[in-house]
């Protein structure tokens, strides 16, 4: 059986883009001034982790939040595991932006992402059903 991945993505484009935009809109800058027992890197990274795991769970993956330091999700059964390591926190956006650095923009039919947001986009692609 051959799968036309482009056609499958095109069928789901609007929903996929909304999921991606939801993750990209989260300001997940590390904020050591707000670190506590429930927010080891500040509230932003925890919010991004919770959102990411919620997407994975919604799509049928078994998820686990490890004390807000990390999370994982799995699908299927077996003795072998494929691990993909990534992070959802970002460097501070700084100043000088023409637009909100946490609001994705489509320009000329293309999704424009700032460099630090590409990290989140890569994690999101892993969870696509």
Task: Describe the residue ranges of each PLM region.
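N-terminal helical capping/dimerization or prosegment-like subdomains
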Residues: 2-94
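Hydrophobic transmembrane alpha-helix bundles
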Residues: 1, 68-72, 101-109
């Amino acid at each position: 059986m051959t799968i036309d991945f482009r056609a499958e993505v095109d069928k789901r484009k609007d929903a996929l883009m909304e999921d991606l935009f939801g993750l990209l809109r989260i300001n997940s800058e590390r904020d050591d001034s707000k670190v506590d027992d429930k927010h080891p890197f500040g509230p932003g990274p925890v919010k991004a982790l919770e959102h990411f795991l919620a997407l994975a769970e919604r799509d049928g993956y078994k998820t686990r939040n490890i004390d807000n330091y990390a999370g994982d999700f799995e699908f299927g059964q077996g003795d072998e595991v494929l691990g993909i390591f990534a992070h959802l926190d970002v460097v501070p956006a700084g100043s000088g932006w023409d637009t909100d650095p946490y609001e994705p923009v489509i320009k000329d039919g293309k999704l424009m992402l700032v460099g630090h947001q590409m990290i989140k986009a890569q994690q999101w692609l892993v969870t696509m059903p």
